[in-house]
């Protein structure tokens, strides 16, 4: 489960303020005051400034020469990030106040909040979080000053941090990890919390900053949970305790965020997967490996079948490839050079032995495939290809396996075994732009068919430390994707260094019903794999040419898409996807036979329908099937049977009584056949009532 970043009421997340001048020798805070800008107590209070080089500065910053700065308000993304980082410091101070033996890890701001890692003797309990939150409120009320201090040398820092082993490790850190807020600036610095009256140091932390002026500039915060976490995310390192929290520019914004968290918890696909009997993760199978139950299997089948139909209409050819392959294939593709950490260990098989146990023929390493693209390259290469065959669009629901660390495995949205709706398109350079344009339209149209309609694009470019091919090839591929993305009319956000090792990509980012952003489809342009695999086609002039390869996963994976849709619809899938589309609920046992006749008629039209013959009372049956998110509930009592009718009952408790049987069947069949994504209600379902 994740929760979206939300702008404050009335704010758009941007900072509309104009630059101001900070005279040499004057604090930024003084210039803010001189300009008449709010400094505390309002959602748009200025918390830091950005200098001409784009660096965020404390309000206590004093430039050596006149400087033009942009004020950063609390209700902007940067402003919230600074508030959250400062709140993380307050949390760390509170932890060391209440747990003096605690050692400090890292404490960065993250989307919608912050966390801090600690080495402690026992895991934190809910009571501990309450006590810590109480102590934090005391610190906020005290108005402690955040005071930046520069270490004269690393030796001075090491001496001061002698009892903080994790901070000592960070003194020499050069990883560039964005979560490491302690170092990374031009200087090695600490931030001390000072008593506002005496200016005595109360507490401090290794940190590059920036921070808000005082703890009173934290308007609203809350601790949300704790969990175990490996130091620096590496399971080979020590296991620490992580406390998560959130902080906002106003109590109103915090309250709105808490409401979103609570709604996200209600929609959590892991919770709904159990309640609706959709899927599970048996311990006997292993972490990140899902099994789909019959109801979940129906939803999955419908997702796949509709996708297959659309791909057939769009000219794709269906292929299939095995789950394991010799190591050499992934040497050729480059996966073992650039992606080995994401692959499961090899299996050595096919060895032959002599009678005395000595090896006659050594075995070979085989790998579970992490991607389908190398195998699709082999399909293309299996015979000679002509320009007349291009573009060649290959499509597969291919199951792949990726070694995700146990700490990041999360329900269906981060798994180890996943089925990708994987397409690879081979085309000429002349066809490339048109193919990308039509592909992007196809992706957006298909996602819209499933009820996801709020999109923007992200352009991921080369990681300078992790790529194959020449700079010229990467530049051409990146420019083409940027051109196609811009033509789409959607917002195109840069993602520097975010591409896979073989080519740049456009990813379709989707917002769900709660406004959360999910990366969905990816489109990657690849000039490198055709060269690595020696792919060629015969051009119109008889010469041998290399095709361009386009990688595309539309859902990302079936599992992840299933989880996202479950949360988007809060488990109430559109009727065309619902595992049970209609249920007959008799008032009494004598009405069962009639409802079974109605059900038989619906089944003849392909409707997935059941009749509840349990011993429960009708009211309890209605509650049960409402909780099971069945879109159409059909009630029948004496009057309905006599009139050859049913009464519709919907999940929002609305009802249509006395609907003639034929009209009821027609309405349900019509709703499903039109693939309506809205939840049916008495207002939306147009049907003639007999009453």
Swiss-Prot record:
GO cellular component: cytoplasm
Annotated positions binding Zn(2+): 373, 424, 551
Cofactor descriptive note: Binds 1 zinc ion per subunit.
Subcellular location: Cytoplasm
This protein's record includes keyword Aminoacyl-tRNA synthetase: yes
Top-level enzyme category: ligase
Chain positions covered by the region annotation Catalytic: 268-574
SUPFAM superfamilies, per database record: Class II aaRS ABD-related, Class II aaRS and biotin synthetases, ThrRS/AlaRS common domain
CDD domains according to UniProt: ThrRS_anticodon, ThrRS_core
Listed InterPro entries: aa-tRNA-synt_IIb (IPR002314), aa-tRNA-synth_II (IPR006195), aa-tRNA-synth_II/BPL/LPL (IPR045864), Anticodon-bd (IPR004154), Anticodon-bd_dom_sf (IPR036621), TGS (IPR004095), Thr-tRNA-ligase_IIa (IPR002320), Thr/Ala-tRNA-synth_IIc_edit (IPR018163)
Residue numbers spanned by region Disordered: 1-22
Gene Ontology biological process terms in this record: threonyl-tRNA aminoacylation
Pfam family, one: HGTP_anticodon
All copies of domain TGS, residue ranges: 1-73
Cofactor: Zn(2+)
Keyword Transferase: no
Protein keywords: Aminoacyl-tRNA synthetase, ATP-binding, Cytoplasm, Ligase, Metal-binding, Nucleotide-binding, Protein biosynthesis, RNA-binding, tRNA-binding, Zinc
Assigned EC number: 6.1.1.3
Gene Ontology molecular function: ATP binding; metal ion binding; threonine-tRNA ligase activity; tRNA binding
Annotated catalysed reactions: tRNA(Thr) + L-threonine + ATP = L-threonyl-tRNA(Thr) + AMP + diphosphate + H(+)
Quaternary structure annotation from Swiss-Prot or TrEMBL: Homodimer.
Family: Belongs to the class-II aminoacyl-tRNA synthetase family.
Function as written in the Swiss-Prot or TrEMBL entry: Catalyzes the attachment of threonine to tRNA(Thr) in a two-step reaction: L-threonine is first activated by ATP to form Thr-AMP and then transferred to the acceptor end of tRNA(Thr). Also edits incorrectly charged L-seryl-tRNA(Thr).
Entry protein name: Threonine--tRNA ligase
Organism: Mycobacterium marinum (strain ATCC BAA-535 / M)
Gene (UniProt): thrS
